[in-house]
């Protein structure tokens, strides 16, 4: 997400959907589709498809959202550093959909 004009387009890193049961959803998606589990715990999982990641999240822990790579947030005091050292913050679009701005650049 950049306000500067560039020839490259922004990248959607993942889409997060709310599920009732992480393990049950992992089983469904990995048997129904060709994807790989790259992380899972009790509150979320990440499945890697060929072109995008799908996050399965528990509603009480994570909102459904679209994550867009935005390396400009690395120095934003409102951003949060995660255990994998990625940095993110949530914003709302005009229709109150959650967007996660995400950077893999290390602080």
Q: What residue ranges belong to the model's regions?
A:
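Loop/turn position at the start of each blade in beta-propeller repeats
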Residues: 10, 42, 84-86
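Conserved short beta-strand elements that form part of the metal-binding/catalytic scaffold
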Residues: 35-69, 98-105
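Conserved active-site tyrosine of GNAT-family acetyltransferases
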Residues: 25-30, 96
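Charged, low-complexity surface patches
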Residues: 18, 36, 85
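Vicinal oxygen chelate
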Residues: 22, 61-107
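N-terminal beta-strand motif that seeds the catalytic metal site of vicinal oxygen chelate
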Residues: 1-26, 53, 64-66
């Amino acid at each position: 997400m950049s306000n500067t004009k560039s020839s490259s387009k922004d990248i959607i890193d993942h889409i997060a959907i709310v599920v009732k049961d992480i393990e049950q959803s992992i089983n469904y998606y990995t048997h129904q589709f060709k994807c790989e589990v790259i992380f899972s715990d009790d509150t979320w999982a990440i499945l890697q498809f060929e072109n995008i990641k799908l996050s399965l999240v528990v509603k009480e822990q994570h909102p459904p959202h679209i994550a867009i790579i935005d390396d400009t947030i690395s120095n934003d005091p409102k951003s949060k550093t995660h255990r994998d050292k990625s940095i993110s913050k949530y914003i709302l679009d005009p229709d109150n959909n959650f967007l996660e701005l995400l950077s893999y650049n290390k602080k």
